[in-house]
Amino acid sequence: MRHIRRAQPEDANRIAEIEVFCYRLNFYPIFREDAFYFGEFQVTNRIGANQEHLDELLVYDDGVVKGFLRVADGEIKKLFVEPVLQGSGIGAKLLKYAVEQENARFLWALEKNEKAIAFYHRHGFRVTEERKFEEGTTEYLVRMELSR
């Protein structure tokens, strides 16, 4: 698919930027943990963490990396798009690629992340009965599976 490619080491900084901005936008309102979201969860800390999974990362790059996806063993582990570009179709393209080219069939979404659940639902994923706690929290994750 056009503009989607395997991540390279030089993408690590941009991937980390997108990840940190998306975490703050989507998860800070739920968890409200200042020390984590504005202290330890920094771009410089995420660069190395993402490089460890470079073989599982794909980026949407049309000259600038605008989104990324992590897929492993049929599971979508992460899918984030630069916040100011959300709603432009980049996430849908990454998700389609994950399903068609990487055989992605399921994911775990934070139960309170209604925006993410609605996005995946629009693209053929359904919430199952399976739930588990997000590690180290009292918030639930719900399992979503491709229903097509």
Task: Describe each model-derived feature in a short phrase.
Residues H3-E17:
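A short beta-loop-alpha structural element at the N-terminal edge
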Residues V20-I47:
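Conserved GNAT-fold acetyl-CoA-binding loop/helix
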Residues T44-L58, E75:
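A short helix-loop-beta-strand connector motif used in the catalytic cores of GNAT acetyltransferases and
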Residues V59, V64-F80:
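Conserved beta-strand in the GNAT
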Residues L85-Y97:
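Conserved acetyl-CoA pyrophosphate-binding loop and the N-cap/start of the following alpha-helix
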Residues E100-K112:
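Conserved GNAT acetyl-CoA-binding A-motif
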Residues W108-L110, R126-V142:
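Conserved catalytic-core motifs of GNAT/GCN5-like acyltransferases
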Residues Y120, F125:
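Conserved active-site tyrosine of GNAT-family acetyltransferases
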